[in-house]
Amino acid sequence: LGDVYKRQDIYVGTSVRDVTKADYSYILNHDVITEQLSAKLVPTSLPKRMLADGSYEALPQSEPVDTDYSAIGNIDPSLTEGVAPGQRAIPYFRFADGMAKNGSHDIMDVVEGRITLDEFVSELSIDDLIHLLGGQPNTGVANTFGIGNMPEYGIPSVMTADGPAGVRIAPEVGICTTAFPCSTLLACTWNPDVLEAVGRAGGEELKENNLALWLTPAICIHRSPLCGRNFEYYSEDPFVTGKLAGAMVRGIQSNNVGATVKHFALNNKETNRKNSDSRVSERAAREIYLKAFEMIVKDENPWAIMSSYNMINGYRASESEDLLTGILRDEWGYEGMVTSDWWTCGEHYKETNAGNDLKMGNGYPDRVKKAYDKGAISRSEMETSVKRILGLILKLD
């Protein structure tokens, strides 16, 4: 991954305005491998990278991939901008008929231990699997859509809620929730107990309004003060971000509702946010932009991760197998659900293949079915993602 200084200075304090350089030294006379990793997120169009001494090193270039390629033809761009599942999902909306479909089991058989989740999912049809891979219409006070929604199998509609500074419910609903300080201000406390208390209170409000998945915390790094979503993010420091946002996750999930850590990853620009390319060296990606995510995944086990709109070194984050499978699952051991951000430009079947389990705010069942018929996605890939989605639902009270 490159050259580093042989010496690092350590500062100790309670804030950036109150730090002291530690009067301490430690000499290591031999190399020690603390963790061995494989090449992931390799740059394709990054001409150089900065070394620890401030000099630059040239990087090899490769031919960029066609991010719009699809085995079933390019998607209509109008379908990637705010199409609500309430409009698209009417033919797929499920109403219970009182019996498990085709005489098979329902989800309560899994809950009560009569069959395993693997056995239950194996009984679902291809159309059933595809249905579960996409977002579902709002119910109750929700306005960011939900997951599940297959009553004939006993699978409920489980609703999400946005809100970087409190649980967001539309004003016309007539329900008020607490407006907490934004993430940047909370991070200025340097106090995990405060963040955990905010998360616990927000999780309680989520639960009392029959919502199950809070689309927070957002933990991308403050790379530039001009990023339009900096107020949602915590800090320019990965360690501060990981510790404090981790406490937020811990507080939220103490209510048996889910936190959604986002935007995974390197989402540092709002202009052209769905097609911008975050070009970064592997070392910078791991040590700066992915570190807070790694800390939270390993320490707090968030129920969900949200992939980001942007590309990373030429690949859409939501279609990046390196990111969503190689790093997140294989290296960090994550076992939860990954959802896309709402209406990404990624192709649904390609996202599923990469490890992005859920397409929000709606799925594209016709396109996934077409991809399946052409052999571009397998039943096994769909089952893997559906088990993660249902696994989240099964955690709820």
Where are these regions (language model features)?
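Short beta-strand elements
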Residues: 18-37
